[in-house]
Amino acid sequence: KRIQLLLRIPNLPDDDCPEGFSEDCNIVLRMEGYKRSDYEGKEFKPHWEIGKELGIFDAERAAKLSGAMFALLRGDGARLHRALIQFALSINSEQNEEILPPHFVRPDMMMGTGTLPKFEADAYKFRDDDLWAIPTGEVPLTNLHAHEILSMDELPKRYMAYTVCFRREAG
């Protein structure tokens, strides 16, 4: 019971972290690669509209297959998705070891990252197995060395992964 109570204590923010209750309270610390003036005063379409116009997103068939809030990429959209994954992994491969982790983990791995119990309602659990579908690649990556003591000369560990993320959320 004590462990269950301790798991519900949130992480405390750093004292330098600004207080805020909405996105309007966010503070921009720095901007890289573009000037705000390049984008101010211009209208932009949401990505789902652009994707539909280009014929690379098919929200109707995705909804037919799985319900609302799912994606189906076609043709160039599917190829673009694959290319972006390959690009991201490739540009980071010199500094990081690529890992292809399991998509399902034990409950203690979900607890080790703070996913359980806090986000239990947003997570998918297998009915007949004591396994959870990973909500993000961070869960298996941060637990690669769970219950181990690493020496300083083994650090830092730098990992990267592309994974499917299973979680109930919309927006």
Predicted segments, located by residue:
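N-terminal alpha-helical targeting/anchoring segments
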Residues: 1-37, 52, 56
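TRNA-recognition modules of translation machinery and tRNA-sensing kinases, especially anticodon-binding
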Residues: 30-171
